[in-house]
């Protein structure tokens, strides 16, 4: 009983702290740039009060930084963030839909290329962005098709899935994340309604149907939240 009360109090505290948090872009590219989407995303995460967070598809690390700020506001240093990404374009991305890594703003291009001398999509650049939380963050470079099989997913209580958009990749990522759901965790999938990547929706719908999970479509059909019934 006391444990449930404590969880409720922590959840309320996290949501109060969230009111002071805004989804910041940190002078980088992010897919959550549309009005209020970032704040809604953070609010959704806060409602679950996770401590062990996995992001599949880190890109420039903007969402990672926002998530770490949120988790710190709720748990101080008692949280863990794990991020998987290829951190670059190579042969493994040839069949994938990769976000445009070039800036529309020439000032940002100059800043990264000539001042920081960094590729913002590199492991080095993302590590630099997250250095404030270096003791809480574990970034892993590689293909999720291979990496997830080697991870102890039972320790993760929240997955944000925004990696490869090919049907087989999404299917694989979801299947390897099953232990998270078995432990009453949450998987939040981005780009559920992405018209030029129909494999995302197909893989999610099949996964939910086969396993008889609960699915909730959020924010104008953009996100699919999967949990046990």
Give the ranges of each region predicted by the language model:
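Class I SAM-dependent methyltransferase Rossmann-like catalytic core
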Residues: 2-49
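S-adenosylmethionine/decaboxylated-SAM
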Residues: 27, 35-229
């Amino acid at each position: 009983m006391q444990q449930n009360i404590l969880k409720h109090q922590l959840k309320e505290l996290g949501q109060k702290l969230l009111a002071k948090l805004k989804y910041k872009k940190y002078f980088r590219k992010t897919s959550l740039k549309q009005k209020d989407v970032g704040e809604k995303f953070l609010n959704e995460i806060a409602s679950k009060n996770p401590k062990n967070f996995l992001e599949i598809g880190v890109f420039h690390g903007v969402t990672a930084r926002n998530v770490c700020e949120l988790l710190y506001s709720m748990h101080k240093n008692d949280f863990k963030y794990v991020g998987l990404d290829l951190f670059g374009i190579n042969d493994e991305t040839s069949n994938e839909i990769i976000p445009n890594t070039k800036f529309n703003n020439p000032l940002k291009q100059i800043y990264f290329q000539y001042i920081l001398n960094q590729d913002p999509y590199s492991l080095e650049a993302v590590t630099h962005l997250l250095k404030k939380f270096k003791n809480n963050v574990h970034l892993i470079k590689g293909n999720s098709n291979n990496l997830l099989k080697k991870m102890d997913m039972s320790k993760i209580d929240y997955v944000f899935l925004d990696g490869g958009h090919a049907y087989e990749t999404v299917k694989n990522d979801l299947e390897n994340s099953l232990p998270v759901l078995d432990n009453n965790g949450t998987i939040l999938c981005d780009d559920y309604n992405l018209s030029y990547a129909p494999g995302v929706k197909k893989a999610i719908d099949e996964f939910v149907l086969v396993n008889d999970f609960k699915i909730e479509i959020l924010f104008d059909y953009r996100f699919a939240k999967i949990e046990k019934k």
